[in-house]
């Protein structure tokens, strides 16, 4: 599974500015989803890879980013 890491509080994606390989995104994806996860900046959001099937990713149901 893959997807954008999401802030549970506000429903927004984790933003990033440096597209492609991005230490911030990689660190955040690993912190949320475990050391086997990967991450990079895609379309100015942190995209996480190698996730378990039940991983919660953006968009959150009933939670719109403001």
From Swiss-Prot:
GO terms for biological process: defense response. The keyword Phosphoprotein does not apply. Expressed by the venom gland. Coiled coil: none annotated. Keywords: Disulfide bond, Ion channel impairing toxin, Neurotoxin, Secreted, Toxin, Voltage-gated sodium channel impairing toxin. CDD domains: neurotoxins_LC_scorpion. One of its GO terms (cellular component) is extracellular region. Is susceptible to be neutralized by human antibodies scFvs 10FG2 and HV. Residues 1-66 form the LCN-type CS-alpha/beta domain. Disulfide bonds join 12-65, 16-41, 25-46, 29-48. It is found in: Secreted. GO terms for molecular function: sodium channel inhibitor activity; toxin activity. Beta toxins bind voltage-independently at site-4 of sodium channels (Nav) and reduces peak current and shifts the voltage of activation toward more negative potentials thereby affecting sodium channel activation and promoting spontaneous and repetitive firing. This toxin is moderately toxic to mice. Belongs to the long (4 C-C) scorpion toxin superfamily. Sodium channel inhibitor family. Beta subfamily. Has the structural arrangement of an alpha-helix connected to antiparallel beta-sheets by disulfide bonds (CS-alpha/beta). This is Beta-mammal toxin Cv5.
């Amino acid at each position: 599974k893959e997807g954008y890491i999401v802030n549970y509080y506000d429903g927004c994606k984790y933003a990033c500015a440096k597209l492609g390989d991005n230490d911030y995104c990689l660190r955040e994806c690993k912190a949320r989803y475990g050391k086997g996860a990967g991450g990079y900046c895609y379309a100015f959001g942190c995209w996480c890879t190698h996730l378990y099937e039940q991983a919660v990713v953006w968009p959150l149901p009933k939670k719109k980013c403001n």
